[in-house]
Design a protein with these regions (language model features):
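DNA major-groove recognition helix of helix-turn-helix/homeodomain DNA-binding modules
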Residues: 53-69
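Short, charged recognition helix plus adjacent turn
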Residues: 12, 37, 62, 69-81
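A short, Lys/Arg-rich alpha-helix, primarily the initiator
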Residues: 1-23, 27
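Residue-level signal for the short linker/turn that defines the boundary of a DNA-recognition helix
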Residues: 5-8, 19, 38, 51-55
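Recognition helix of helix-turn-helix/homeodomain-like DNA-binding domains
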Residues: 29-51
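Short secondary-structure boundary/hinge segments and terminal tails
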Residues: 27, 32, 77-81
Length: 81
């Protein structure tokens, strides 16, 4: 099975932060209502399949003390011409 870019990026950022996905999911559940809890298996499957919600990615980034940056690539195209 081909690894999707989201999977690679989340794995790399977990490694950079020194946290495991288990620790991240535990922190996710601390901030969620009891009826909205998730599991390591659920999040892992979503990451692998590429079906994870953007809101969950933002939640993971926040736990890792990271920001997601949207960069205007049109400016790069103009500068590289």
């Amino acid at each position: 099975m081909k690894t999707n870019p989201i999977h690679k990026e989340i794995k790399a950022n977990l490694a950079r932060s020194g946290m495991t996905l288990t620790e991240v999911v535990s922190k996710m559940n601390m901030n969620r209502a009891a009826d909205n809890q998730t599991t390591i298996q659920n999040i892992s499957n979503k990451i692998i399949r590429g079906t994870i919600k953007y809101s969950e990615i933002l939640e993971i980034a926040s736990i890792l003390n990271m920001n997601i940056v949207w960069k205007d690539t049109r400016k790069e195209e103009i500068q590289n011409v």
